[in-house]
């Protein structure tokens, strides 16, 4: 599943390659992915130019024309790729923005991804309604607010972080990495964390996600960002390392289920 670093990598690639392109037509083999209606999407966007690509958490925002904003969520396995106009859509290709000389195709094996067309003035209310937390930077991710939310909660820390309300963009891979770096057991109850643990967790979230962005995300299993290969998978310390030695203490990495999610951790470094 693409997490914030992978989505940011896609955003940067799209920004380089499609900003300035005019949408000549739009094709869909699975129009239900457009939650706000495919016909309305065609009517509003055909003939307009893409002026920018931004991001909020795991959501991509296509800035089109003066007031249109196309919100794209990749969900589990959504991918974009550029192709020439004469390339037919394949089995798992569901949507395509066609430009003058090429097309941007959206593929999604599970069909979980979504497109939504909203106006510029609806963007802020849209994300407020989603209750998405701040971006993982020192400028936006306030440690005191983070601490207060943790101290009021009896939730287990891993599923709480996955909710996206504390901070934006964490998924299963990077939550495991963050908790390992901060030496916190994934089942630790949030309000049982010490002040020093919360401080380390806050900084670890920023460190891991910013490092992953710098390295272009993780290219594992079926996921790569617009055909590019990230390098963060080479830096993972616990995710996918079941049975291997912890690089910090030498004990064996274990895998358990936490809130239904496969979870990798070191039982020695990350004690309850």
Swiss-Prot record:
MF-aspect GO terms: 8-oxo-7,8-dihydroguanine DNA N-glycosylase activity; class I DNA-(apurinic or apyrimidinic site) endonuclease activity; damaged DNA binding; zinc ion binding
Cofactor: Zn(2+)
SUPFAM superfamilies found in the cross-reference section: Glucocorticoid receptor-like (DNA-binding domain), N-terminal domain of MutM-like DNA repair proteins, S13-like H2TH domain
Swiss-Prot/TrEMBL catalytic activity: Hydrolysis of DNA containing ring-opened 7-methylguanine residues, releasing 2,6-diamino-4-hydroxy-5-(N-methyl)formamidopyrimidine; 2'-deoxyribonucleotide-(2'-deoxyribose 5'-phosphate)-2'-deoxyribonucleotide-DNA = a 3'-end 2'-deoxyribonucleotide-(2,3-dehydro-2,3-deoxyribose 5'-phosphate)-DNA + a 5'-end 5'-phospho-2'-deoxyribonucleoside-DNA + H(+)
EC numbers, comma separated: 3.2.2.23, 4.2.99.18
Keywords associated with the record: DNA damage, DNA repair, DNA-binding, Glycosidase, Hydrolase, Lyase, Metal-binding, Multifunctional enzyme, Zinc, Zinc-finger
Xref: Pfam families: Fapy_DNA_glyco, H2TH, zf-FPG_IleRS
Function: Involved in base excision repair of DNA damaged by oxidation or by mutagenic agents. Acts as a DNA glycosylase that recognizes and removes damaged bases. Has a preference for oxidized purines, such as 7,8-dihydro-8-oxoguanine (8-oxoG). Has AP (apurinic/apyrimidinic) lyase activity and introduces nicks in the DNA strand. Cleaves the DNA backbone by beta-delta elimination to generate a single-strand break at the site of the removed base with both 3'- and 5'-phosphates.
Protein name as it appears in the record: Formamidopyrimidine-DNA glycosylase
Originating organism: Lactococcus lactis subsp. lactis (strain IL1403) (Streptococcus lactis)
């Amino acid at each position: 599943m693409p997490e914030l670093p992978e989505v940011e990598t896609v955003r940067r690639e799209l920004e380089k390659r499609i900003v300035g392109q005019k949408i000549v037509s739009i094709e869909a083999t699975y129009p239900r992915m457009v939650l706000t209606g495919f016909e309305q999407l065609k009517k509003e966007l055909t003939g307009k130019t893409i002026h920018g690509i931004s991001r909020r958490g795991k959501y991509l925002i296509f800035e089109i024309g003066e007031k249109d904003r196309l919100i794209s969520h990749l969900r589990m396995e959504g991918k974009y790729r550029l192709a020439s106009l004469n390339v037919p859509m394949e089995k798992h290709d569901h949507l395509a923005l066609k430009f003058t000389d090429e097309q941007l195709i959206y593929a999604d094996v599970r069909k979980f991804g979504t497109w939504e067309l909203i106006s510029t003035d609806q963007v802020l209310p849209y994300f407020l309604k989603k209750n998405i937390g701040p971006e993982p930077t020192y400028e936006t991710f306030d440690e005191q607010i983070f601490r207060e939310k943790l101290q009021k909660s009896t939730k287990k820390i891993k599923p709480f972080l996955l909710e996206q309300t504390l901070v934006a963009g964490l998924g299963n891979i990077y939550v495991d990495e963050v908790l390992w770096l901060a030496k916190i057991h994934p089942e630790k109850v949030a309000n049982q964390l010490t002040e020093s643990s919360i401080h380390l967790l806050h900084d670890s979230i920023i460190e891991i996600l910013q490092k992953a962005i710098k390295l272009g995300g993780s290219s594992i299993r079926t996921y790569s960002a617009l055909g590019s290969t990230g390098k963060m998978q080479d830096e993972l310390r616990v995710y996918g390392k079941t049975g291997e030695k912890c690089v910090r203490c030498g004990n064996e990495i274990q895998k358990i289920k936490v809130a239904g999610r496969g979870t990798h951790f070191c039982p020695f470094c990350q004690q309850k």
